[in-house]
């Protein structure tokens, strides 16, 4: 994994997040809170363990994992998912599976920004973060 991912990132733009949350099955009240949140994402690495911590006024979440190894996580909207994160062509690609459903979260670096593309079925959301 590129060390350029490491550090603290703040959300600067978000496109189609509400539709993505709807596709996930997130209820209206939680979607409203999610849309208002301006999360900070802290990515760190210790040995071969990567940690992604997301902090917002809505909720804090943290996942720690080894690339390519499945782990369990509880998402910000309280889904219990099995996830795997892999590295391909410079992107951190996360696949979450729960209740027969699947979503992908791709994190890539573009011009010094972290571009996060979330996809559920045919709904795509793009969130852009700048390093703090």
Curated annotation (Swiss-Prot):
Disulphide bridges: 118-125
GO biological process, one term: membrane organization
Location in or out of the cell: Cytoplasm
InterPro entries with a match to the protein in the record: Calycin, Fatty_acid-bd, ILBP, Lipocln_cytosolic_FA-bd_dom, Myelin_P2
Residues holding hexadecanoate: 107, 127-129
Annotated positions binding (9Z)-octadecenoate: 107, 127-129
Short name of any one Pfam family annotated for the protein: Lipocalin
GO molecular function, a single term: cholesterol binding
Gene3D superfamilies: 2.40.128.20
GO cellular component: cytoplasm; myelin sheath
Subunit and partners: Monomer.
Additional detail: P2 protein and myelin basic protein together constitute a major fraction of peripheral nervous system myelin protein.
UniProt similarity note: Belongs to the calycin superfamily. Fatty-acid binding protein (FABP) family.
Task of the protein: May play a role in lipid transport protein in Schwann cells. May bind cholesterol.
Domain-level remarks: Forms a beta-barrel structure that accommodates hydrophobic ligands in its interior.
UniProt-recorded name of the protein: Myelin P2 protein
Species the sequence originates in: Sus scrofa
Encoding gene (name): PMP2
């Amino acid at each position: 994994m590129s060390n350029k991912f490491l550090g603290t990132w703040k959300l600067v733009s978000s496109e189609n997040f509400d539709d993505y949350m709807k596709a996930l099955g997130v209820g209206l009240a939680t979607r409203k809170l999610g849309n208002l949140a301006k999360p900070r994402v802290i990515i760190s690495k210790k040995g071969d363990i990567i940690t992604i911590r997301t902090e917002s006024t809505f909720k804090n979440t943290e996942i720690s994992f080894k690339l390519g190894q499945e782990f369990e996580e509880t998402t910000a909207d309280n889904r219990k998912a099995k996830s795997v994160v892999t590295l391909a062509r410079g992107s951190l690609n996360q696949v979450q599976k729960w209740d027969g459903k699947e979503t992908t979260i791709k994190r890539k670096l573009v011009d010094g920004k972290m571009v996060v593309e979330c996809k559920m079925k045919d709904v795509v959301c793009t969130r852009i973060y700048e390093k703090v």
